[in-house]
């Protein structure tokens, strides 16, 4: 296919038009008085949202150069969302401001490479200043305040704070749709996986249709168990100990399963068999996690262990096990804390080195099951449109709160970026050409506050001047129009969110400014429709 090639100023301006179209759509959502954007869907109800990355993903432009410009900015929003879970609109506003100022300077003859270097050094200085001024998040109330701002709802903020208090920052907080109104929180203690009992005859609590064991042994095997003679030696040892047995294996069937069921029905020996969670290599990893958590070993021929030779010291233990039709929960495994910490550290390293979103999600789940726990927030609403919008807001707020716990918080509403940034840039030593890059960043760090003011119906220039003269940490509460101590009012942003937004915006601005040519697909003319059949639709 033929290509269109554009050079110099024309190329950069084409990209900028696409950036501006996307940024102007997204930035109306910024701040407590930001508006929503309605997104049409090919199927089903439209989506109403104020989430920057969701809006950005939906924007497709006709002009090939504008399309490329918009795609570059989408990448800023997506990267910020991936790293910090929020701040997507802020990152787009910052990118637009940097590109606009930068292109003016390039058009006036500034060296793009020096500009880029100046921008990078300035952003590094501002990021360092933000981290230095950060306040650690310690109390449940502080976490709730952070989550409330992201979700725009204090009740959601309180529920997220409770969830993180229970499961810790490594724990998993998932958001599910509910058939009822309101928002509920459910906490799962211990490790839970989505495999239930292999036979309903194992049930010990008929009312709840669950098998509940106190202090059972746990047999973990990575192969299929069909023969009763393989299972009998270890079962005999467990019977002599007077305890119950949970069997986790690739599968349990045939005479092995029948024998366990018969012994349970006759009241001779209580046990329950479940399939191992996951598939392939992930199954092996999860079995190893269960073994570490319960203080047992995976009985596998790969490590020279056979089921018929298994002894009680190879079995795991837990304070309580609950098995339902669909899932198994192991509470308070007897594994050593050192081994669990080592396993957690290993998974964390894998998480850092993983590029796949799917793998990262699964590793995060494993990490949570070992180190924290799982909290489920169930959200309901009157209509499907409201339900989807509410669920999305809660997911963003969860990630925002986790980011706050990780690196701390700074004053929100664009105040920290403006105040910390201005003082950091004042002391920065740069060459005369790089100093132009500093001026671009100095102008850009005002942009979020300007947009928040504009969306609140205030005069941006007046607000920026006022906030610049206020003490560190004071700023504009855009919901009331008052100038207040932001942190004491609960108006805060996680440092990770603000820092990621600034760094990602600077990265894309540098690419824009150093672009000298753009190669795009040349749209093919659509073939003219053929002549209509004169006899079509007539009966003969």
Curated annotation (Swiss-Prot):
Localization: Cytoplasm
Molecular function per GO: ATP binding; ATP-dependent protein folding chaperone; isomerase activity; unfolded protein binding
Pfam families: Cpn60_TCP1
GO terms for biological process, alphabetical: protein refolding
Region (Disordered): 520-540
Known function: Together with its co-chaperonin GroES, plays an essential role in assisting protein folding. The GroEL-GroES system forms a nano-cage that allows encapsulation of the non-native substrate proteins and provides a physical environment optimized to promote and accelerate protein folding.
Similarity annotation: Belongs to the chaperonin (HSP60) family.
Name of the protein this chain belongs to: Chaperonin GroEL
Gene transcribed to yield this protein: groEL
């Amino acid at each position: 296919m033929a290509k269109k090639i554009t050079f110099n100023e024309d190329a950069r301006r084409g990209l900028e038009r696409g950036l501006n179209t996307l940024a102007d759509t997204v930035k109306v959502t910024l701040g407590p008085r930001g508006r929503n954007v309605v997104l049409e869907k090919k199927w089903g109800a439209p989506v109403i949202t104020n989430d920057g990355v969701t809006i950005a993903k939906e924007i497709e432009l006709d002009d090939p150069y504008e399309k490329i410009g918009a795609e570059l900015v989408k990448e800023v929003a997506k990267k910020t969302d991936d790293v910090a879970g929020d701040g997507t609109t802020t990152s787009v506003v910052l990118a637009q401001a940097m590109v606009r100022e930068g292109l003016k300077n390039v058009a006036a003859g500034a060296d793009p490479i020096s500009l880029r270097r100046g921008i990078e050094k300035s952003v590094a200085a501002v990021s360092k200043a933000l981290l230095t001024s950060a306040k650690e998040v310690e109390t449940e109330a502080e976490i709730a305040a952070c989550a409330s701002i992201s979700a725009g709802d204090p009740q959601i903020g309180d529920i997220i704070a409770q969830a993180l208090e229970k499961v810790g920052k490594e724990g998993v907080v998932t958001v599910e749709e509910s058939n009822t109104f309101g928002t509920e929180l459910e906490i799962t203690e211990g490790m839970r996986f989505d495999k239930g009992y292999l036979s309903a005859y194992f049930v010990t609590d008929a009312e709840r249709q669950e098998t509940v064991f106190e202090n059972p042994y746990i047999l973990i095997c990575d192969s299929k168990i069909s023969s009763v003679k393989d299972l009998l030696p270890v079962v005999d040892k467990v019977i002599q100990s007077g305890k119950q047995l949970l069997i986790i294996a690739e599968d349990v069937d045939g005479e092995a399963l029948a024998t366990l069921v018969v012994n349970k029905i006759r009241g001779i020996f209580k046990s329950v068999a479940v399939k191992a969670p996951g598939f392939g290599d992930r199954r092996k990893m999860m079995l190893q996690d269960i073994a570490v958590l319960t203080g047992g070993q995976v009985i596998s021929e790969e490590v020279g262990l056979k089921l018929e030779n298994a002894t009680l010291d190879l079995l795991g233990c837990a304070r309580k096990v609950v098995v339902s039709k669909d899932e198994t929960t192991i509470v308070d495994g007897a594994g050593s804390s050192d081994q669990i910490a080592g396993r957690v550290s290993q998974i964390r390293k894998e998480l850092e080195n993983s590029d796949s979103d799917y793998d990262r999600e699964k590793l995060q789940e494993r990490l949570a099951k070992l180190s924290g726990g799982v909290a489920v927030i169930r959200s309901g609403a009157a209509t499907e449109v409201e339900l989807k919008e509410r669920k999305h807001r809660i997911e963003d707020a969860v990630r925002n709160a986790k980011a706050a716990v990780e690196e701390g918080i700074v004053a929100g509403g664009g105040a920290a970026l403006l105040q910390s940034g201005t003082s950091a840039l004042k002391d920065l030593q740069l060459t005369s050409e790089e100093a132009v890059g500093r001026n671009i960043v100095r102008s850009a760090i005002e942009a979020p506050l300007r947009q928040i003011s504009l969306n609140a119906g205030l005069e941006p220039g007046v607000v920026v001047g006022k906030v610049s003269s206020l003490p560190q940490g004071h700023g504009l509460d855009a919901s009331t129009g008052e100038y207040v101590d932001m942190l004491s009012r609960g108006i805060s942003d996680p440092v990770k969110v603000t820092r990621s937004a600034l760094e990602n915006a600077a990265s894309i601005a540098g690419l824009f400014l150093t672009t000298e040519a753009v190669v795009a697909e040349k749209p093919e003319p659509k073939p003219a429709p053929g002549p209509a059949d004169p006899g079509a639709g007539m009966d003969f």
